[in-house]
From Swiss-Prot:
The keyword rRNA processing does not apply. It comes from the Bacteria. Keywords: Nodulation, Plasmid. This is Nodulation protein NolB. Regulates cultivar-specific nodulation of soybean. Residues 37-57 are annotated as: Disordered. It comes from Rhizobium fredii. Induction: By flavonoid signal compounds.
Length: 164
């Protein structure tokens, strides 16, 4: 069975002329809209938000501790008062006129403040942490299974009660 096919070359000028005409019409409308926007902005005063001056904040080296980076950022935000590192009694002090840069380490008394609470010191910290996370994961999995089981039982009991 043969189907009549219209030649592409015969129909192309008709299709192209209408699409080119639409494109030209669109471009004219776009140009008119741009001109009217220019006229509107020229007649009304331009309102711009005030731009704050850029702050001189430098990124700390990735090897510096987090506390030093935080103190440097705070010091850059408040250049009049430099924030010093916390003393062993955990109180931070503001120093006026201190040189900028990372905080200096305070002398530590023997055995005072050298260990963190709840975190064992030594090379086995990572292994202990992984074991703790594994136990936590197992506990959460058990709770999820019990919760799903109770939900299934509750659903079954509700169906039985509805059926009578």
């Amino acid at each position: 069975m043969m189907l009549p096919v219209t030649s592409i070359s015969n129909s192309l000028p008709r299709v192209a002329s209408s699409s080119f005409g639409e494109q030209a019409q669109f471009e004219r409308a776009l140009a008119q809209a741009a001109d009217s926007m220019k006229n509107d902005t020229a007649s009304t005063p331009v309102r711009t938000a005030p731009i704050s001056p850029p702050m001189d904040v430098h990124r700390a080296a990735p090897t510096s501790p987090l506390k030093d980076r935080v103190l440097q950022t705070i010091s850059a935000i408040c250049p009049d008062s430099i924030v010093a590192a916390a003393a062993p009694n955990h109180k931070a002090a503001l120093i006026s006129g201190a040189p900028p840069g990372p905080s200096q380490k305070l002398p530590v008394e023997d055995g005072a403040g050298t260990e963190r609470l709840g975190i064992p010191q030594g090379g086995h910290d990572f292994d202990v942490m992984v074991a703790g996370l594994r136990d936590l994961y197992n506990g959460v999995t058990q709770v999820a299974l019990v919760s799903k089981g109770i939900s299934g039982i509750t659903s079954s009991v509700n169906k039985l009660l509805k059926e009578g």
